[in-house]
């Protein structure tokens, strides 16, 4: 009698565990089947003879409330990314720069490039490091359709840093061991999506 009662009590337990496992598998399939489309990105660096970047960062900012931000890194020549279908704003910029830093990258309108502060001859001076070459692609409206074939995007990054040369005449050079100079009135940063420099000068 005791044997029969134990069997009747224990049989439902394995069935209950199996139900939990199957439910977890079904949920996993829903996540794995989230629809994405391929985006084949090709970058044209014509005219960039020196200091070609090794890596670029690509960000798709959703313009729909239910969309998801997609962030990835590609070789300088480009590559393929997987993006859910939808409407996006898009940013591409050269990555792994020594001086240029990025902040505010949670939104298309706030992502900003800048350089860190540095200490000049006078500790009270407000100075920043000179930026290296920085290239950007900013697209306000990109539609990613649901498709089995990859969408092809051919992009040409734009240089957003200007270079200037200065000649300094020094008298009595035999008595000088070093010369330090700096330029004032420079912009403190650059908004990638808005294509605007910050108003604050350094």
Describe every region a protein language model picked out:
Residues 42-53, 167-175:
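Structural motif
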Residues 46-78:
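Post-signal-peptide N-terminal segment of Sec-exported extracytoplasmic proteins
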Residues 167-202:
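Short helix-loop boundary/capping segments
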């Amino acid at each position: 009698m005791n044997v029969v009662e134990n069997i009747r009590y224990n049989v439902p337990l394995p069935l209950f565990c199996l139900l939990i496992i199957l439910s977890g598998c079904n949920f996993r399939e829903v996540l794995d089947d989230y629809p994405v489309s391929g985006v084949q990105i090709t970058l044209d660096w014509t005219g960039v003879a020196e200091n070609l970047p090794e890596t670029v960062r690509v960000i798709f900012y959703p313009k729909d409330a239910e969309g998801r931000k997609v962030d990835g890194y590609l070789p300088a020549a480009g590559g393929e990314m997987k993006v859910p279908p939808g409407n996006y704003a898009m940013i591409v910029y050269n990555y792994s720069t020594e001086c240029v830093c990025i902040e505010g990258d949670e939104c298309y309108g706030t992502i900003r490039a800048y350089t860190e502060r540095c200490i000049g001859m006078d500790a009270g001076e407000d100075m920043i490091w000179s930026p290296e070459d920085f290239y950007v692609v900013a697209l306000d409206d990109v539609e990613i359709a649901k498709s089995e074939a990859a969408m092809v995007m051919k992009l040409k990054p734009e240089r957003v840093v200007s270079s200037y040369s200065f000649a300094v005449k020094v008298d009595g050079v035999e008595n000088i061991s070093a010369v330090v100079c700096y330029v004032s009135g420079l912009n403190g940063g650059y908004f990638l999506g808005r294509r605007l420099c910050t108003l604050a000068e350094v």
